[in-house]
């Protein structure tokens, strides 16, 4: 006992210092070990999140590709068939051609000239209107289906708890979904008369200086078609052409839709407002211009290949070009699986990029 007391008195300071060091070291070890475990847990969580992100990206890519297939195999064929029938019904040139054929030797020169001039206007109106309608309707439907598909994917992810960013997204009612998709028929069922009238006015303005004996070459035909398109697109207020594709905008609705707290606004109206915002965007206007130009160039090139050697390339009188224009109608409005023009537009790099970015633009 005396030995212990003596040892303590003699080495107390050293013992306390040693104990303090050991205690501090143990505490530091525990802190380090705890910190290391937290870092390991965090790394596992981050790895899990990255894995989930990759899974979601893969699922989104697959869903995006399936949506494009739905457009090409289901939605677009129905719309194109409906459009083709309506254009044939509304712009019928057969009665003019019949009068020209039946009146040979019986019509006076002024009567014959008037009929040829009517045929000229109607032929160009029908060709350009068909070209414009097919292009715009195909792009519009693709916008619709991508917007709807994106919302449906988001709603599914929300229901499964796959994303913490989707808490405020409302589920789409089945009726709203069907109503939204069926609104693509607006062009054919509601807007066609005014579209024909305005397109015919544009054709008359561009063609008023062209005579039946004027020589039409490939380049002249391309320029003429694009001039009619440009006059039509630039007449009226900016983006007036959107009102041929969808019902006119309700400004009151647009304001209330921007307020996410207004539950009285249906999902259908939210989808329609979002669609209109896409259509009036600079990016969409750009792909419209690119698509219409591409369609026109390919169509005229195809017309050239179907003429006799040295036809449009060297030039033909306008009167002899009109029957060729009539032959293009079935080609322009052919079903999507056989429509070369739609396939070319769909595969344009600018169009592909636009719809990829549109689908990837997840609502916050």
Swiss-Prot record:
One of its GO terms (biological process) is peroxisome organization. It is found in: Peroxisome membrane. The chain crosses the membrane at residues 15-32. The keyword Membrane applies. GO terms for cellular component: peroxisomal membrane. Its main location: membrane. It comes from the Eukaryota. Residues 33-62 form a coiled coil. Belongs to the peroxin-3 family. This is Peroxisome biogenesis protein 3-2. The lineage of its organism: Eukaryota, Viridiplantae, Streptophyta, Embryophyta, Tracheophyta. The gene is PEX3-2.
């Amino acid at each position: 006992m005396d030995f212990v007391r003596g040892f303590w008195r003699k080495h107390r300071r050293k013992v306390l210092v040693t104990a303090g060091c050991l205690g501090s070291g143990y505490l530091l070890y525990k802190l380090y070990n705890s910190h290391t475990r937290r870092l390991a847990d965090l790394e596992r969580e981050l790895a899990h999140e990255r894995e989930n992100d990759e899974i979601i990206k893969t699922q989104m890519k697959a869903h995006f590709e399936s949506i494009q297939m739905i457009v090409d195999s289901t939605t677009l064929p129905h719309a194109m068939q409906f459009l083709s029938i309506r254009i044939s019904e509304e712009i019928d040139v057969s009665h003019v051609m019949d009068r020209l054929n039946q009146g040979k030797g019986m019509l006076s020169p002024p009567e014959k000239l008037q009929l040829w001039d009517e045929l000229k206007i109607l032929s160009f109106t029908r060709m350009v209107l068909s070209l414009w309608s097919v292009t715009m309707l195909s792009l519009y439907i693709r916008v619709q289906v991508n917007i709807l598909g994106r919302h449906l994917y988001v709603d599914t992810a929300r229901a499964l708890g796959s994303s913490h960013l989707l808490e405020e997204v409302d589920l789409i009612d089945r009726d709203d979904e069907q109503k939204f998709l069926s609104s693509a028929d607006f062009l054919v069922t509601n807007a066609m008369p005014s579209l024909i009238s305005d397109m015919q006015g544009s054709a008359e303005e561009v063609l008023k200086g062209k005579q039946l004996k004027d020589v039409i070459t490939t380049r002249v035909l391309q320029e003429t078609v694009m001039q009619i398109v440009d006059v039509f697109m630039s007449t009226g207020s900016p983006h007036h052409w959107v009102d041929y594709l969808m019902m006119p905008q309700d400004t009151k609705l647009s304001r209330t839709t921007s307020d996410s707290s207004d539950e009285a606004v249906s999902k259908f109206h939210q989808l329609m407002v979002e669609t209109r915002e896409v259509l009036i965007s600079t990016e969409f206007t750009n792909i419209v211009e690119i698509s219409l130009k591409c369609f026109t160039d390919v169509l005229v090139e195809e017309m050239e290949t179907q003429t006799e050697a040295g036809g449009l390339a060297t030039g033909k009188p306008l009167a002899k070009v009109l029957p060729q224009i009539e032959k293009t109608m079935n080609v322009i409005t052919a079903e999507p699986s056989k429509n070369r023009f739609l396939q070319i537009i769909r595969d344009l790099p600018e169009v592909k990029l636009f719809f990829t970015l549109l689908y990837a633009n997840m609502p916050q």
